[in-house]
């Protein structure tokens, strides 16, 4: 029932919007069951752990095996201490064959905004997170 509902709603929306963002849990249920239409861009998001990057790599490989091949697939690494990936994580990104779209630094202000119910779009213009996200959007050409 839920899968059919998601599929129906996405189909209704796709003719009205230039972009549709579908946030999946760490898995491929919506893709493997054919619920979502073909997408142009698949953005995999991981924390900065090696295991998280490995999971993103497995999802990218599964997408390929299911013949679900977006025009572009990339990785965003989120909540990175000081905004700097360590050598082990960078090595794992290379090992997984993932394109790094960007790194979003850890920021306590994002946590506080969430606690206060404020959208992160209201972060100050000089916020490192806002700057990182704007860079990723620019890199994607959105």
Short names for language-model regions:
Residues 1-103, 112:
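Conserved catalytic-core segment of NTP-binding enzymes
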Residues 86, 126-129, 133:
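Generic structural signal for well-ordered, non-membrane alpha-helical segments
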Residues 106:
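Active-site donor-binding loop signature of nucleotide-sugar glycosyltransferases
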Residues 116-127:
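C-terminal boundary of histidine-terminating zinc-finger modules
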Residues 132-142:
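C-terminal alpha-helix
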């Amino acid at each position: 029932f839920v899968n059919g509902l998601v599929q129906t709603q996405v189909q209704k929306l796709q003719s009205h919007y230039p972009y549709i963002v579908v946030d999946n849990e760490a898995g491929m249920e919506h893709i493997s069951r054919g619920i979502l239409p073909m997408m142009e861009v698949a953005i995999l998001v991981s924390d900065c752990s090696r295991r998280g990057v490995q999971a993103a790599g497995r999802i990218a490989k599964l997408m390929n095996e299911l013949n679900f091949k977006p025009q572009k697939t990339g990785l965003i690494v989120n909540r990175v201490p000081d905004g700097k990936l360590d050598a082990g994580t960078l090595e794992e990104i290379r090992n997984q064959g993932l394109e790094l779209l960007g790194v979003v630094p850890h920021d306590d202000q994002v946590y506080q905004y969430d606690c206060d119910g404020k959208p992160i779009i209201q972060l100050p213009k000089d916020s490192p997170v806002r700057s990182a996200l704007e860079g990723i959007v620019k890199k994607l050409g959105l």
